[in-house]
Amino acid sequence: MKLSQVVVSAVAFTGLVSAANSSNSSSSKNAAQPIAGLNNGKVAGAAGVALAGALAFLI
């Protein structure tokens, strides 16, 4: 059961990253580089939350 929860969280995380990357790639043409950096920071923060959730399931 724990393994399936980790797999589900990993799939949700990859879906989140792919959605963020697609939105960034389409809007980065008109966006300034600092704004793109902030978006990357938000993606990294979401990655940390997803990893913390996966570790919480393992413990």
Swiss-Prot record:
Presence of keyword Protein biosynthesis: no
GO cellular component terms given for this protein: cell periphery; endoplasmic reticulum; fungal-type vacuole; plasma membrane
UniProt-listed GO biological process terms: plasma membrane organization
Signal peptide per UniProt: 1-19
Residue ranges the record marks as coiled coil: none
Record bears the keyword Cytoplasm: no
Induction / repression: By osmotic stress.
Family from the record: To yeast DDR2.
Protein name as annotated: Protein HOR7
Organism of provenance: Saccharomyces cerevisiae (strain ATCC 204508 / S288c)
Gene: HOR7
